[in-house]
């Protein structure tokens, strides 16, 4: 019986780890996670109020991830003017996020997805590693995904999100 349970658990966790990432036009999967200060953040908190730029990244304090976080930091005012809330997500601990935020003066929350539930829900886990791929989702106030960026280049993430926002303004 224990073996059947273990096999079922392994199958389920493997399926979640390799779930497809949602695409533009899909309903964004709901999520709930704790930020660097232990505050619960839920996608539903923003429904009907704000767009959400949910960006997943591999690791605090690494070159590309720091560049990406600082890029969003430098543009968070512009994004806020467009009614966008920036939320970062990685497998790092709340303590690591607190240090990362303090070191680089980040001005948006980081979800400590230490168990990988949020990453798995969005299909962005890096294989079996406790690490997320670099993927960003722009989620509308209606809960639908407006744009997905999955390139490894952190600068492209912001530029593509900005272009998607500019496209919204024109329509």
Give each language-model segment a name:
Residues 87, 97-133:
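Short, internal strand/loop/helix patches
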Residues 64-78:
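Typically the conserved alpha-helix immediately C-terminal to a functionally engaged Cys/Sec
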Residues 46-66:
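Short active-site neighborhood of thiol/selenol oxidoreductases, capturing the structured segment around
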Residues 22, 35-36, 139-140:
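Short, acidic, Ser/Thr-enriched surface-loop or helix-capping motifs
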Residues 132-171:
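Thiol-/selenol-based redox modules, centered on thioredoxin-like
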Residues 28-29, 51-52, 133-135:
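Short loop/turn microsegments at loop-to-beta-strand junctions
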Residues 2-30:
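N-proximal helix/coil linker or "cap" segments that precede and/or mark the start of modular domains
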Residues 31-51:
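A short beta-strand-turn-helix
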């Amino acid at each position: 019986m224990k073996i059947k349970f273990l096999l079922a658990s392994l199958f389920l966790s493997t399926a979640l780890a390799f779930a497809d990432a949602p695409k533009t036009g899909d309903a964004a999967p709901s999520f709930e996670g704790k930020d660097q200060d232990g505050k619960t953040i839920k996608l539903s908190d923003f429904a009907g109020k704000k767009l959400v730029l949910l960006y997943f990244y591999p690791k605090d304090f690494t070159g590309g991830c720091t560049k990406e976080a600082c890029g969003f930091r430098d543009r968070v005012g512009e994004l806020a003017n467009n009614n966008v809330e920036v939320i970062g997500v990685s497998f790092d601990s709340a303590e690591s996020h607190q240090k990362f935020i303090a070191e680089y003066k980040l001005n948006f929350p980081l979800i400590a997805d230490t168990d990988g539930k949020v990453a798995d829900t969005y299909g962005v886990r890096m294989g079996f590693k406790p690490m997320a791929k670099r993927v960003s989702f722009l989620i509308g106030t209606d809960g639908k995904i407006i744009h997905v960026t999955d390139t490894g280049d952190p600068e492209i993430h912001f530029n593509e999100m900005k272009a998607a926002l500019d496209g919204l303004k024109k329509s």
